[in-house]
């Protein structure tokens, strides 16, 4: 990671991206996981955990879905930063 940082002024972006990937490995991610928002609002394995909660809390399903959609937008922003 240090080499990336010394490469250029874009090093900061690279570090942010790497940190996001690291946290994705731990299970807490900004939305860089396989399904984006999965790890953002669920507790264990992304979509499956969210689906499990969905059956129990039908009232909160819609709110949860809204948050997942927002998380997917964050994924797009993240990918754009990575490209730039």
Curated annotation (Swiss-Prot):
Composition bias type Gly residues, residue spans: 28-40
Biased amino acid composition, Basic and acidic residues: 53-65, 73-84
Name of the protein: Uncharacterized protein PB21E7.10
Compositionally biased region (Low complexity): 1-14
Location of region: Disordered: 1-84
């Amino acid at each position: 990671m240090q080499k990336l940082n010394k490469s250029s002024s874009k090093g900061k972006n690279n570090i942010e991206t790497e940190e996001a990937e690291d946290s994705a490995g731990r299970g807490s991610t900004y939305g860089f996981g396989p399904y984006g928002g999965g790890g953002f609002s669920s507790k264990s394995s992304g979509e499956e955990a969210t689906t499990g909660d969905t059956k129990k809390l039908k009232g909160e399903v819609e709110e949860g879905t809204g948050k997942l959609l927002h998380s997917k937008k964050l994924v797009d922003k993240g990918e754009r930063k990575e490209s730039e």
